[in-house]
Amino acid sequence: MAPYSVVASVLAAAPPQQSGSVRQLPSTINRAITQRSQSRHVASASSASSPTTMLEERDNLWEIGGPYWWPFSSFTPPAHLDGSLPGDRGFDPFSLGTSWGQPPVDVSDPNYDESRLRWLLEGELYNGRLAMLAVVGVLTVEAQGKGPWWEIPGNLNLFGTPYVVAVVGGHLAFALLEKKRLENFRETGEAGHFGAARFDPLDLTEANPLGTDYNRQAEVRNCRLAMLTFLGFSVQAWVTGKGPIENAKDHLASPFEANIFTYGDRGTNVVAIFSAFAAVMHIAELAREKKAEDKPRSRNRTLSGSS
């Protein structure tokens, strides 16, 4: 899929189009954002020294809706998500932001927890960018009639080089690039790409009149959409044995005869697995919120008992 990487890079770098000026959020949402910002700790780093992946203006959201992914306004986001990261909707039901991941910085660093969140964001962006490239490659391969996308890699012959040799060479090249990314993160707080901690060779960030925050939010949205899309492609391949374009044609031709429930146990199992995961995720969020509410109460009881 290497010949399509240039096209994919352009698509990945371009922010989604939006007609007219950016709409202001409703007053109720503005109030929710104000309350959210006041209830969270203030970031210590200035915008000049912060990584370019951080928002210049906290809670600078373009999505219509509140700053919290949970549909009930009475719930509050986790304390470690302070709105300074792009795409921050308070989504961390399993509290991974406080325990998951080991950033390449000293554990004794006073900003270690902030580095962890930035490191997790780098992981999301990196996987999302790969997913955007993969989605374009999957669709292009099938649109050209070259067969299912999962069968293509083993049949490729890149410039007369056997596929295995190309894979080994690619891994060695990426190992060097990953080493540079780690060094960049230690020095600047972001990893970047191809040796640059701020990878923007076409200056698309500065060229967008909507501002850098819009670009950062747009990239995170596109990354998440691409990761979900590629997951859908993979599930389709396992359930139906067909590519996304062929599946779409079959479903549009006969919606009631070609859908996830008409492919036997595999389709039913997929629905059951995703439904169970969604239920566990919401239960975990309820438990996290309940725990957050109990902490102040316990502290108040302790203070009243000692006085």
From Swiss-Prot:
Chain positions recorded as chlorophyll a 6 binding sites: T52, M132, E190, R198, D200, L204
Signal peptide: none
Disulphide linkage map: none
Positions that bind chlorophyll a 9: Q236, N247, A258, I260
Cofactor: binding comment: Binds 11 chlorophylls (Chl-a and Chl-b) and the 2 carotenoids violaxanthin and loroxanthin.
UniProt cross-references to Pfam families, sorted A to Z: Chloroa_b-bind
Membrane-topology descriptor: Multi-pass membrane protein
Residues annotated for chlorophyll a 10 binding in this entry: E151, H251, P255, F256, N259
GO biological process: photosynthesis, light harvesting
Binding-site positions, chlorophyll a 2: L81, P86, G90, F91, D92, E124, R224, F274
Entry binding sites for chlorophyll a 3: L120
Classification via InterPro entries: Chloro_AB-bd_pln, Chloroa_b-bind
GO molecular function annotations of the record: chlorophyll binding
Keyword terms of this UniProt record: Chlorophyll, Chloroplast, Chromophore, Membrane, Photosynthesis, Photosystem II, Plastid, Thylakoid, Transit peptide, Transmembrane, Transmembrane helix
UniProt keyword Chloroplast present: yes
Binding site for all-trans-violaxanthin: D200, L202, F233, P244
Protein's job: Component of a light-harvesting complex (LHC). The LHC functions as a light receptor, it captures and delivers excitation energy to photosystems with which it is closely associated. Functions in a far-red LHC by absorbing far-red light and promoting photosystem II (PSII) excitation, likely with entropy-driven uphill excitation energy transfer. Exhibits a typical absorption band at 671 nm (Qy band), as well as a large far-red absorption band at 706.5 together with fluorescence emission at around 713 nm (F713).
Transit peptide (first-last residue): 1-44
Protein name: Chlorophyll a-b binding protein 1, chloroplastic
Record-stated family: Belongs to the light-harvesting chlorophyll a/b-binding (LHC) protein family.
Annotated chlorophyll a 7 binding sites: E63, Y214
Assembly mode: Homooligomer. Component of a light-harvesting complex (LHC) consisting of 11 chlorophyll a-b binding proteins.
Chain sites annotated for binding chlorophyll a 1: G65, Y68, R89
SUPFAM superfamilies referenced in this protein's UniProt entry, alphabetically: Chlorophyll a-b binding protein (SSF103511)
